């Protein structure tokens, strides 16, 4: 009994594509493996209708050739199983992901360094590790600090932090105030010399002490003359009547006096002041009444001679002379001692001390306060003796 011939040999290929969808015409998608349809043997066939056909299952999309760096090849089902490979091909020109990070680390280290030139051009200090999978930034972290190095296509450079730390820079000297003013824009404080210095003189009889502050003078009067131990807050202000202000010129002190320390009474009047010779002032009848010199010329105290000017000395001594009840006619010999004081009073013009405005206190004294005007009692400008 003869078997029928195989149907596959004489069938239409379109019918085969209808029964096997994977054998249809391929579109733009991934291609399937080629189909091998061998010629049936001339003898009797052993299998069924599809015994002589070998069909391959659709292959998955292969990796792109750009990633593998190999020519475009396709493998069919007849090629056999793929052999495992221990080597993964990596393109040589591929940029390392840690290069940018290493550059940032090196830039930050160079900026924070105190060295003048942290970039040292020369041979590479160390190369990258040949181990696969070790990135350059990891290698930089493994190295000890201060031995960073990098190699790129453009050139090699390295930087040793330990060499920079071993030679610190020499500290610069401090800037003068003038240079700091120009660099930082800070206003420099100018030292202004005051044209006159205000001093305070005690008006207590035979005291004449001169101090630089009003609080010190008030404390002196309160403790020494008034015998009070009260604090300034509890005081009634009586010590204000026992001292006056003195205007002492800086130029006068520097020219006429050697220093501001107390000296002996022999150096009370400085010889450097100019002397003005006026004939009408040398005559005794022409002298005004408030400028009459006292009969016994009192030597000024040593403390007063160091800081007070001749004008203040003369005015205070004349005031003490006017308080004497007896009127003395000026003698020719005594008039000769007055021209230096008179010439100094005319030549040196300073502002009026504060104590000159309180006339009632100077005329009547502290013992006869009942004769004072109301303004003087309330420590105001005197209204009785106007200048």
From Swiss-Prot:
Residues 27-36 have a biased composition (Low complexity). A motif (Nuclear export signal) lies at residues 253-263. According to PubMed:14630949, expressed in heart, skeletal muscle, liver, kidney and pancreas; undetectable in lung, placenta or brain. According to PubMed:14625278, ubiquitously expressed, with lowest expression in brain and ileum. One of its GO terms (cellular component) is nuclear speck. Keywords: Cytoplasm, DNA-binding, Metal-binding, Nucleus, Phosphoprotein, Transcription, Transcription regulation, Zinc, Zinc-finger. A zinc finger (C2H2-type) spans 200-225. GO terms for molecular function: DNA-binding transcription factor activity; RNA polymerase II cis-regulatory region sequence-specific DNA binding; zinc ion binding. Its main location: cytoplasm. A motif (Nuclear localization signal) lies at residues 351-354. It is found in: Cytoplasm; Nucleus. Signal peptide: none annotated. The modification Phosphoserine is found at residues 264, 268. GO terms for biological process: regulation of DNA-templated transcription; regulation of transcription by RNA polymerase II. Residues 285-303 have a biased composition (Pro residues). Residues 1-97, 139-179, 283-305 are annotated as: Disordered. Transcription factor involved in SLC2A4 and HD gene transactivation. Binds to the consensus sequence 5'-GCCGGCG-3'. Interacts with MEF2A. This is SLC2A4 regulator. It comes from Homo sapiens. The lineage of its organism: Eukaryota, Metazoa, Chordata, Craniata, Vertebrata.
């Amino acid at each position: 009994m003869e078997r029928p011939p195989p149907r596959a040999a004489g069938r239409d290929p379109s019918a085969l594509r209808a029964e096997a969808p994977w054998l249809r015409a391929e579109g733009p998608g991934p291609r399937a493996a080629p189909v091998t349809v061998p010629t049936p043997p001339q003898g009797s066939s052993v299998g069924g209708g599809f015994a002589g056909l070998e069909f391959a299952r659709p292959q998955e999309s292969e990796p792109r050739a750009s990633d593998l760096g190999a020519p475009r090849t396709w493998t069919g089902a007849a090629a056999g199983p793929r052999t495992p490979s221990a080597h993964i091909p990596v393109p040589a020109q591929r940029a390392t992901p840690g290069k940018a990070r290493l550059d940032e680390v090196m830039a930050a280290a160079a900026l924070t360094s105190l060295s003048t030139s942290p970039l040292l051009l020369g041979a590479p200090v160390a190369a990258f590790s040949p181990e696969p999978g070790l990135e350059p930034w990891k290698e930089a972290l493994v190295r000890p600090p201060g031995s960073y190095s990098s190699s790129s296509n453009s050139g090699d450079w390295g930087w040793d932090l330990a060499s920079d730390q071993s030679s610190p820079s020499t500290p610069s000297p401090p800037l003068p105030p003038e240079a700091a003013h120009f660099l930082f824009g800070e206003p420099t404080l100018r030292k202004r010399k005051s044209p006159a210095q205000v001093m305070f003189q005690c008006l207590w009889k035979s005291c004449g002490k001169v101090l630089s502050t009003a609080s010190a003078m008030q404390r002196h009067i309160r403790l020494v003359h008034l015998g009070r131990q009260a604090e300034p807050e509890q005081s009634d202000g009586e010590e204000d009547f026992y001292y006056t202000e003195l205007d002492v010129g800086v130029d006068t002190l520097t020219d006429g006096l050697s220093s501001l320390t107390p000296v002996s009474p022999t150096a009370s009047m400085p010889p450097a002041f100019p002397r003005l010779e006026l004939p009408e002032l040398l005559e005794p009848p022409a002298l005004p009444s408030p400028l009459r010199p006292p009969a016994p010329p009192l030597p000024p105290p040593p403390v007063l001679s160091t800081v007070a000017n001749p004008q203040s000395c003369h005015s205070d001594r004349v005031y003490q002379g006017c308080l004497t009840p007896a009127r003395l006619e000026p003698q020719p010999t005594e008039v000769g001692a007055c021209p230096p004081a008179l010439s100094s009073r005319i030549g040196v013009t300073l502002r009026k001390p504060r104590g000159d405005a309180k006339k009632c206190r100077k005329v009547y004294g502290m013992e006869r306060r009942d004769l004072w005007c109301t303004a003087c009692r309330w420590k105001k400008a005197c209204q009785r003796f106007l200048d």
